[in-house]
Amino acid sequence: MTGSKKTPSTSPSKKLSSPPEVKLRHRFAKRQIRRRRIDLACGCSIYIHINCVNNGFTHRGTHHCSSSSEWRFYLGASKSPIFQNTASGDANVHTQPGISHSSQSKPQHEDSVGSPQSLLQLPSLDDVDDDFWADLLK
């Protein structure tokens, strides 16, 4: 016989671990930026998904636009933020009249059980005459 014999491999079995391409895909997916942090003037921080850009939200009576005018800038290490506003002042903040704007944390108001004042009070169906129901169901 002229063929040479193969020696068995000393490396661990490849069937026991994930294929390398799957590991690479998982590592890449973990590195992707999925949300963006915005630090508000009141001291709160929020996270906005990158697909939700240019959508607004209201926090403590102040409307914020999550557009490019609010962004987070890093120098050096990932934990050293410098917050930048490209517009001078608070062009991205819209205050709503009639809502207090104190910077202290307050509990939310409880929802009332009664009907809102903007809706009309409908009469009870028990107060409707029997003649009305007889005419209606003919």
Swiss-Prot record:
A zinc finger (unnamed) spans 42-59. Phosphorylated. GO terms for biological process: symbiont-mediated suppression of host innate immune response. Belongs to the geminiviridae transcriptional activator protein family. It comes from Pepper huasteco yellow vein virus (PHYVV). InterPro entries: Gemini_AL2. One of its GO terms (cellular component) is viral capsid. Residues 85-106 have a biased composition (Polar residues). Residues 124-138 are annotated as: Transactivation. Strong activator of the late viral genes promoters. Enhances the expression of the capsid protein and nuclear shuttle protein. Acts as a suppressor of RNA-mediated gene silencing, also known as post-transcriptional gene silencing (PTGS), a mechanism of plant viral defense that limits the accumulation of viral RNAs. Suppresses the host RNA silencing by inhibiting adenosine kinase 2 (ADK2), a kinase involved in a general methylation pathway. Monomer. Homodimer. Homooligomer. Self-interaction correlates with nuclear localization and efficient activation of transcription. Monomers suppress local silencing by interacting with and inactivating host adenosine kinase 2 (ADK2) in the cytoplasm. Interacts with and inhibits host SNF1 kinase. Binds to ssDNA. It comes from the Viruses. It holds the Pfam family Gemini_AL2. Its main location: host cell. The keyword DNA-binding applies. This is Transcriptional activator protein. GO terms for molecular function: DNA binding; structural molecule activity; zinc ion binding. Residues 1-23, 85-123 are annotated as: Disordered. Keywords: Activator, DNA-binding, Host cytoplasm, Host nucleus, Host-virus interaction, Inhibition of host innate immune response by virus, Metal-binding, Phosphoprotein, Suppressor of RNA silencing, Viral immunoevasion, Zinc, Zinc-finger. It is found in: Host nucleus; Host cytoplasm. Residues 1-20, 113-123 have a biased composition (Low complexity). A motif (Nuclear localization signal) lies at residues 23-37. The zinc finger and the transactivation region are involved in PTGS suppression.
